Amino acid sequence: MDFSPPHGLRGGRSPSLQDTTISSSHTQKNGGDSTPLPPINERLAFLRPSRELLEYYRKKIAEFDEEHEDLVKRLEQYKATYEEQHKLQWEMRQREEEIAELQKALSDMQVYLFQEREHVLRLYSENDRLKIRELEDRKKIQKLLALVGTSEGDITYFHKEPPSKVTIPQRTVQSGDPFDRKVQRSGRAGVKQVPLKAPGKQDRTKAAEKEDPQILLLQVEALQAQLEEQTRLSKEQIETLLEDRKVRMEEAQVQHQRDQDKMKAMTDKLNKTQKLLYESTRDFLQLKFECRANEKSWMAEKDRLLRELDRCREQLAFSIDPEQEREHEREHEREILRLSLAEKATRSSHSEEVKSLTEQLAQAHRLSEMYREQCVTLEDELGRIREEGDVGREIFKERSDKVAKRLQLMTQRYEALEKRRNMEVEGYKTDIKLLRQRLKDVEKQLFKVTLNIGPDQDLAILDAVRQGNKKTQKIQGELRNLKAKIYGLENELRIG
């Protein structure tokens, strides 16, 4: 900042080198005897500034005011821009956190959805099992009815409860030869045997041949449907996990690239700040060196001028009368005041420049410390992000291993179910064969019993029929309970 006016704008006459030397020497020699210096306003009153000088300083002050206002406006604009950038960065960070939370919630919802679908599949399998069991129970009832057989006096109820007591019609006692009654009973037994044996046997064999394969086919279809549903569910789970893995890898890659760009930008800023700090420090040291050199040159010039002033005073001591000497001293005092004011102005300007440079250096140090702290925080954040990425990779690897193990376990379970189904089919076939053999044996025994039936065996047959009715009643009660359970499960499935 140059406050010195150009040549020709200074007020009053310019002092010569000889006058300056004489006035400085006189001031130093008579410093102890003369009165103290007048105040600054009184000393400024001796100056005679011109209009050009005042106009020059007004222009300088106006330029400095405009420059100051421009710098303040720029500083405010920079502050507003930095605050807006910080606000946008903060909002972007919040949005990223919200996106991460939403993605986590979406993953949890997918897991819950798959769990609910597995639960629904289990309910479907339970429903199929109960329906197949209902068919088996019906088949058993029909077999039992076929084994027991029906007579003209017996009534079988399927929808209502059977009577608690079995009523048997009484036969009238016939007179005559007992041999004739025996033949008649055997004849009636033969009449009963012919319609009961052949059609009952054929119906039972046909029902066994028709119903058993039907139940097995239903079981096979239910197992196939369950296997298809489980396979489709497993495929969807694997596809969802792969898609989630792909999304997470893309997000990690984008975040890594963003961190790399941010690190690069911060490194460039740090290098620029270090360069600016170096240049500011170098300029400050250069200005300090120049200021000290100027001070040394001023001191040397002042010593030289003082010596010359002493020599000139000694020469003029005898040639000037006292009045002229006093007038000359007053004139030199005025010149000394002018020189001291100019010297103070230059010193104040230099001190202001040194002060501004010192403030700039301190500001540069603060900026360098701030950028260094930012770099340290960014490095810590980068390390944390890398650690989080490594942890995420490990978690994803563990999840992938768990999914692979689960898939292998499900495959083993499916194979075990297939083996079990095959073994159950073989067991059903063997059971069917055994039941057919037992039916044949029972039919043979019934045939023998009907042939050898006597008068005392009617009550035994009635007891067997009564027991069969009781068993039928018990089985019907169990069937009603099973139907109630099945209807309850179907209602729960509809409501769910």
Curated annotation (Swiss-Prot):
Keyword match tRNA processing: no
Transmembrane segments: none
Matching InterPro entries: CCDC77 (IPR037696)
UniProt feature coiled coil, ranges: 51-113, 214-495
Domain of life: Eukaryota
Positions of region (Disordered): 1-42, 170-208
GO CC annotations, alphabetized: centrosome
Keywords: Coiled coil
Biased composition (Polar residues): 15-33
Name of the protein in its database record: Coiled-coil domain-containing protein 77
